[in-house]
């Protein structure tokens, strides 16, 4: 059997897309995945262009597999994802040994691209945007474990000044309601108990309640439908946009117990001046109002966020406003980075007088504060009973299992060997016994039937 190696960079959307690449090639080519690139017949890099370092790392890693092409002339090397969309033919010009280049919307064409490469002897590039065609062409999802990602929409229409996503993944396109629910129902039949709904702006999803009937459902309606699917016990979603947080979505946190008490809500900055320069479309006051409404509906809601430090023109005063917002909201997790100019975005043309060492110092302060708040939340959970979904063997010890709480905390706990395998994929109750810097420890209380 032929083997497929995939290296994934970037977001959870890319993780999902990589699984779909494996599904497409598994169904069409009979190829199985491997963790060893040296034994692979197909090597794919699913790329991210959000930050410059991630982009350059792709070409670095391509160079590391170049020699395999000489050892195995029939080896197929492909580059997909957002760097592929952004660079296109330039990838082949820079790395002529690359056989196929494809975008996020054309990954379903991989078998045809590989066949064309073999037939013609020329590298194949397809970075077009055929809207939702990708999902129509996908084979049924194959999953292992009780948790799965489901992409419900593609692209972004917000055009924040720092972001390449609208240019690399296209504008927002929602999958039809029936298709999303059918995929999730199929996953539930395979034993999946937890789904994470994915999209660049996942809460911007819109879909017809009945196809061709003209009546439109919003993201809150979709959540209600997912909650009714037998076997699905826990629902997450990412990444959301503050501008798409509606009253109906706030109400969903009251109506839908299966919706977790954790939300990733990117704010990017605590300065109105910087938010306006980023073209985020909300003020700090409006963001705090959203947080108040969310916590009125779900008081124990855990919030994480995205932060960009050192945006062009940011001052010490702007940064201190971000730190103040972090304290006021109580964020307990973040993806935070120093601003990286992306070619083709409006912000790339702005003057950027802030020294790099200042930006790095700001980032260190911000991350330290977030870590402190995360530890405080974890410490507050010690002694409490928590419902977790057991995901598998702990990385800490083969004698232990690990799972996640409703608010997305990793819990490691000892499990007796006769029952260890049977607990994987099940919900159980654990008592939290201690809080470590990046995880919790617990002990089993009960197992759900």
From Swiss-Prot:
Disulfide bonds: none annotated. [4Fe-4S] cluster 1 binds at residues 11, 48, 82. Residues 142-380 form the Radical SAM core domain. Its EC number is 2.8.4.3. Its cofactor is [4Fe-4S] cluster. It is found in: Cytoplasm. It catalyses: N(6)-dimethylallyladenosine(37) in tRNA + (sulfur carrier)-SH + AH2 + 2 S-adenosyl-L-methionine = 2-methylsulfanyl-N(6)-dimethylallyladenosine(37) in tRNA + (sulfur carrier)-H + 5'-deoxyadenosine + L-methionine + A + S-adenosyl-L-homocysteine + 2 H(+). GO terms for cellular component: cytosol. Keywords: 4Fe-4S, Cytoplasm, Iron, Iron-sulfur, Metal-binding, S-adenosyl-L-methionine, Transferase, tRNA processing. It comes from the Bacteria. Binds 2 [4Fe-4S] clusters. One cluster is coordinated with 3 cysteines and an exchangeable S-adenosyl-L-methionine. Belongs to the methylthiotransferase family. MiaB subfamily. Catalyzes the methylthiolation of N6-(dimethylallyl)adenosine (i(6)A), leading to the formation of 2-methylthio-N6-(dimethylallyl)adenosine (ms(2)i(6)A) at position 37 in tRNAs that read codons beginning with uridine. Monomer. This is tRNA-2-methylthio-N(6)-dimethylallyladenosine synthase.
